[in-house]
Swiss-Prot record:
GO biological process per UniProt: translation
Gene Ontology molecular-function annotations: structural constituent of ribosome
GO CC entries: cytoplasm; ribonucleoprotein complex; ribosome
Keywords from the UniProt entry: Ribonucleoprotein, Ribosomal protein
Homology family: Belongs to the bacterial ribosomal protein bL36 family.
Name of protein: Large ribosomal subunit protein bL36
Primary gene name: rpmJ
Record carries keyword Ribonucleoprotein: yes
InterPro entries reported in the protein's UniProt record: Ribosomal_bL36 (IPR000473), Ribosomal_bL36_sp (IPR035977)
Amino acid sequence: MKVRPSVKPMCEKCKVIRRKGKVMVICENPKHKQKQG
């Protein structure tokens, strides 16, 4: 899980979602998981 000021999809399988007001990226590749904060 990467914590970044700006989250961007890194591949075509990445999905940008919102959970509890936080923007997150979920993906098949665990290295691509990101959250904003």
